[in-house]
Every structure is written in structure tokens, then in C-alpha cells.
Amino acid sequence: MPVTQGSGALPARRIVFVHAHPDDETIATGATMACYAADPDTQVVLVTCTLGEMGEVLVPELTNLRADRADQLGGYRIGELEQACTELGVTDYRFLGGAGRWRDSGMLDSPANDDPRCFWRANMDDASEALVRIVREVRPQVIVTYDAIGDYGHPDHIRAHDVTVRAFADAADPDFAPDAGPTWQVSKLYETALSHSAVESAVDRIWRSDLAKTVPEGITMPSDMLLSVPDTKVTTTIEAPGFFAAKIAAMRAHRSQMTVDGFFFALVDGNGRSAKATENFVLARGAVGPGSGSGVETDLFDGVATR
């Protein structure tokens, strides 16, 4: 949960990750978060927008937690998130507006989209203010979230993007929520990205293994698989092989949402053997840093003044 800086001094580098549900932080940015969390001069803050109440339950003994049964999955996933953050070394993790403020919206065009409590229906002023309060407190140089289509079109991912983009501007506006603390201009806003080459490599690996039979029915790869971006659009690549084990351990912590022998786990981590802990990003706001000479940044803080 939130960590208070006792002396009032801020770490030199500060980064906020905004994700939709518990487990998204690990799947999309787990290695990156673990890498930065291990740096004593960097503060990593995770903001999760919902409890993930509408998630599927892949563990038979937990099926009664589902939304159409006891509707207790959200509380259970708080514990999973806590364990995952422990594995990643992240000590400052928060829910936007407080735990349960906005409910998981479910998949696009599902009845859950109509629930007035869901994040998809969130008032943008209210949601932005909730994030602005965190931004003005933490004063991050960098914020990370999804792209405009939410990586794969999930309403909560789309809303997380929209709220983050809005808060990026609102945090620097003295007329917006003046009681939320001194204004702060974030230097960079990044969107998570799957590159074409990474997806093609993962797909090829799956089709060449016994995992092909675990591909969900109806998916024809690669055309109907995960959305990806051209490699040339990627502005930043974080390679953190030393934190690959932490990412896998964090994925295992989300036991209600994924199995270690299935299609999705293999797609993300290369079946736990050959894949590197490489995560890609596209800079959406701010200036691209000098990079490492290849034209691609290797640090989300590249070119940012730390203070």
C-alpha cells in the first residue's frame, strides 16, 4: 500500500503505472516494474483502476467467487495483487479512488458495461481527479498506461488510457482540483506495446509445440490474436532478464486468472524457458530521449531531468 516519505525528500526518479485490473501490471509491465523497483533511487507506484470482479476464474475450487455466484472475486484478487507486488518488489500500490470505487466493466458489449458502478461508466472529471491527486503527491516524471484501444479493446483498458491522458494534462492545470495539491507537469507518458516481431515469434513457438491445442476455440493466429504495433513504432525497449523470474512468480500469484501450462501464459513468457523479460513501449507524450545509439530508448527516464 502507499509508502510515505518520512523525511519529505522525494526519490530522484518517480514512475506511476496505471493498470485496469489486478494481473495487468504483471502481464504488461512486470519485468519493467521489478527492474525499477530494485533501484533505491526510483519510486514505483502502481495504480489499479478496478478489483477485476468480472474476471474469469480458471481454478475450479475458486469458481464460487465469480460475479454470477458469490461475487467475491474482487476481494480475492486484492490478495493476489498484494502477492504479485511482493514478488515484483513494489511496495506502493493503490486502487484508483480507493478499493472498489469503480467496478470491473467486463468485456466489450457485455451486460456488465451497463452497471453504473463500472469503470466504463466513470465520470471523467471524478476519475481524472482521483489520479491527479496521486500524480500531484508522487510528482512522477513518467506515467505508463495502455494505448487508445486498450491493447485489446477491453473497456476498462480503454478507460484507463483515457483517464491517464486526461490526468496528464489536468495535473498541470492550476484550475483543475485546486485542493488536490500543487500542480505537476509529468515529462513523459508511455503506452504499453506488443511489437509485431514479438507476437510473431510467440505465435510460431506455440504452433510448433503441444501448446497449440490449448489455443482458445475461435482464435486464428496471428490475424485474430493479440493486437500489436509495427516494430518501427516502438520507442522504448526494456530488457530486464534479471527480473524474468520475478515476473513469472508474480504471474503465478494471480492464480485465479491464469494457468502455467496454458496458451496465454506461454504467449507472455515463452513457456518459462526461452523468452527474455523484454517489454516494449510507445511514447505518447513528451520527447524521446537519445537512446542507446540505435534510436530506441532503453530507459523510460531517458532524457528526463531527475529531481
Swiss-Prot record:
GO biological process: mycothiol biosynthetic process
Coiled coil: none
Top EC class for this record: hydrolase
Cofactor: Zn(2+)
Cofactor note: Binds 1 zinc ion per subunit.
Gene Ontology MF annotations: N-acetylglucosaminylinositol deacetylase activity; zinc ion binding
Keywords of the record: Hydrolase, Metal-binding, Zinc
SUPFAM superfamilies associated with the record: LmbE-like (SSF102588)
Hydrolase as UniProt keyword: yes
InterPro entries for this protein: GlcNAc_PI_deacetylase-related, LmbE-like_dom_sf, Mycothiol_biosynthesis_MshB
Catalytic activity: 1D-myo-inositol 2-acetamido-2-deoxy-alpha-D-glucopyranoside + H2O = 1D-myo-inositol 2-amino-2-deoxy-alpha-D-glucopyranoside + acetate
Entry-linked Gene3D superfamilies: LmbE-like (3.40.50.10320)
Superkingdom, natural source: Bacteria
Physiological role: Catalyzes the deacetylation of 1D-myo-inositol 2-acetamido-2-deoxy-alpha-D-glucopyranoside (GlcNAc-Ins) in the mycothiol biosynthesis pathway.
HAMAP family given in the database record: MshB
NCBIfam families: mycothiol_MshB
Similarity field: Belongs to the MshB deacetylase family.
Protein name: 1D-myo-inositol 2-acetamido-2-deoxy-alpha-D-glucopyranoside deacetylase 1
Underlying gene: mshB1
